[in-house]
UniProtKB/Swiss-Prot annotation:
This is Putative transmembrane protein 244. The chain crosses the membrane at residues 17-37, 65-85, 93-113. Keywords: Membrane, Transmembrane, Transmembrane helix. It comes from Homo sapiens. It is a multi-pass membrane protein.
């Protein structure tokens, strides 16, 4: 009994990856919107998913919104990626996260070196 590995064509992998990225940022902005409503934040930056410079304090409402929306996004995307990719969910989730870090670095014009941002990202990966 030989081990058979099925490799998807590059086009299919790219389509699934693109769908996962669109799904990720859609869920992210929906969870940010819901967080703003729940925490009664009346103004939040459009680039909030890429903001790692917010002061990490439990007294800072914007930080709470960003933290909760990040955790909710990764949890929900973990569930939504399953029907999209069917298998190799971790590969797609990690690839989307790497792209998110790259986009964050590009948008903020510096690499995120804050420990609280990486801790939130690491905990989020466990939720997938």
């Amino acid at each position: 009994m030989a081990l058979q590995v099925r490799v998807a064509p590059s086009k299919v992998v790219l389509q699934k990856f693109l769908l996962c990225v669109i799904l990720f940022y859609t869920v992210y902005y929906v969870s940010l919107s819901m967080g703003c409503v729940m925490f009664e934040v009346h103004e939040l930056n459009v680039l909030a998913p890429f903001d790692f410079k917010t002061n990490p304090s439990w007294l800072n409402i914007n930080y709470k919104v960003l933290l909760v929306s990040t955790e909710v996004t990764y949890f929900v995307c973990g569930l939504f990626f399953v029907p999209v990719v069917e298998e190799w969910v971790w590969d797609y989730a990690i690839s989307v996260t790497i792209l998110h870090v790259a986009i964050t670095s590009t948008v903020m014009l510096e690499f995120p070196l804050t420990s609280h941002w990486w801790a939130a990202l690491g905990i989020s990966k466990l939720l997938v």
